[in-house]
Amino acid sequence: MSLNKQFFKFVIPSIIAMWVFSIYTIVDGFFVANFAGELELSAVTIVVPYVNFLFAIAIITGVGSQTIIGIELGKGNRDEANKVFTFIILFILAFSVVLALLAIIFMNQIIRFLGADSTLFHLSHDYLSVIVFFSPFYIIAYAFEVLVKVDGFPRTAIIGAVSACVTNIILDYILIHKFQMGVRGAALATGIAQFLSCLIFFIHFRAAKGYLRFVKIKMSAKEVFHYLKKTVVYGFGEFISELNTATFVFIFNLFIIKYLSPEYLSAYAVINYMSLFASSTFQGVCHGTLPLLSYYHGSEERDKSIKIIRMSFIFVFIISVIMYAIAYFGAET
């Protein structure tokens, strides 16, 4: 397969998958705004930075381990790649459960820190309490989606993401519109969708269709530290990018609540959804090229890595121009 075909085989599914992950939040916002109310949408917006934080954790572990695994596969070290894969999934599972337990214990403090006032506190609590329960699936599903691409199955990433998205839309309609469950319904719909996504990806890896599969591992403390350190180093840039998004939304939320009123958060939510869609496109390009770059780095094919980077810059530039034109000429629409 030519390098151009490989590039688009991985990048296009990654962009679509990232769009789908963005749609989770947008769909929740749409149904909450139309069938619950403005205050409910504002409560969802308050919790968005926490959801971004969950994705940041998923990114640093998923992208970091994807790079390590890609390099090992490029070198032909399949056993080592499977060892890293199994270890990182077990680590994510344990870490995300601990994170969820801490969030449950400090739920009220987290909500106040996020900026919820007395008007939004209970609504934000209703939404976050459900999100926290499903948070391990948020992190694992995203990590699985990244790792299934380095396994050579970018289309499976789309299948998992789209299946979950469709489920989310259907459940949002049923739980928010039909059962009038408000923000709890929105959070429950998204949580179940993330669980479904996890299940689809788990079945793929359990079936051992590609290079990666779960194996029995025995690692020393030195090995654990070594792989965690490399994971953090490789995934840190993407982690900071996602954390910046969370910080940006968090600061805007605080200013709007302090100097305007909670109702204005619903208007900001719409703007945030549009910017989320744009940033997801660029993240999709990044995540799509990473498996190729790490593989060719491992196989020491530097010329191919350089060509992929060049194609990425050109592709991102073209997409940026198109998006700017749409935003400029279609702002009123």
Where are these regions (language model features)?
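Alpha-helical transmembrane segments of multi-pass membrane proteins
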Residues: S118-A141, L276
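Small-residue-rich hydrophobic transmembrane alpha-helices
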Residues: L41-L101, Y138-A157, A267-A331
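Helix-terminus/linker motif at the lipid-water interface of multi-pass membrane proteins
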Residues: I23-S42, I111-S118, I174-M181, A246-F277, ...
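Membrane-interface helix-loop junctions in multi-pass transport and translocation proteins
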Residues: C165-L199, A331
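Interhelical loop/hinge segments that connect adjacent transmembrane helices in multipass membrane
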Residues: M1-V11, T190, L199-T245
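Signature of the first transmembrane helix
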Residues: K5-Q66, V233-I257
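Short membrane-interface helical motifs at transmembrane helix boundaries
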Residues: V98-S129, I322-T333
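Residue-level recognition of transmembrane alpha-helices
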Residues: V11-S14, M18, T45-V48, I92, ...
